[in-house]
Amino acid sequence: MLANVNSTYTDVMTSVFSSTIAGKAWFATAAVALGVVQVSTGARIFGKLERIVRIPRPHVNSIHRWSGRVAFLCTLPVAFHCIFILGFQDVSPRVLAHTIMGSFVYGVFAVKMLFVHDRDHPRWALPVLGGTMFAVLVTLWATSALWYFTNVRFGL
């Protein structure tokens, strides 16, 4: 059954990208770009960057929520490829670091979502969790997509 899913996944990814790895790199890059939007709007929500992010508060909240949703969706094909096709790997320190950080990403996301919906936490908790989520995402991107773009090829 997994062979059929792998084949379908490969067919879908290669209909747009030159390879599944290229697709994975671009989806991860989109997630990190949206992560920058998340950090910027999150800081604005907490009263920081008001002079830089000059968007009214209700719009900032919507942008923050929607950029987070789309970033999460961008991570799904990447996670599928990493978990079900590649699996755990430790062939180099870079790959091992990537594998370990990949194990944390959805855990950090789940904790952040629990804190978003629970108002009974210190004010600093959400910014710390958001920053941690962004740091994990950037580390994953740097150990995969950035490496791919600089060492394999840049392009679709």
Language model: regions and residue ranges:
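Membrane-embedded alpha-helical bundles that constitute the cytochrome b-like, heme-associated redox core
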Residues: 1-156
